[in-house]
Amino acid sequence: MHKFVFMKVRDAMTHEVKTVSADTSAGELRELFERYDYNCFPVMEDDKLVGVVTKFDFLKTLVFHPTTMVPAYEDLMKKKVSEFMTRTPFYVSPDQPLTRVLQLMIETRKNSFPVLDEKGHLVGIITYSDLLRQVGK
């Protein structure tokens, strides 16, 4: 735990990030969630972070009001990520302390954050699993 207090995001983040575009379909996203077992994907357009999409965001697309007609599964899977992503995601910098990221995760109830450098480029992602791995070191 002692080392954790002094660590920065860059020391714990996942550097190779899988991303999706705003045009990715819900069906493609479902397959990506299954294949990679990630909870979140950054949404990129023209090398810019435009949002994030989580498993929870995806599952919300399957919810409908009881008085409405039930949409066909195939139609739901054609929805684009842009229709249900979080457009103003929280993000952190590589130089932020892990203790601050942990505090942000608790305050925002988010389990991951994209990591952007000073130029706004996506350089990684930090998850609660990344933090847990570091606590024991």
Whereabouts are the PLM-identified features?
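Tandem CBS (Cystathionine beta-synthase) repeat/Bateman regulatory domains
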Residues: M1-K137
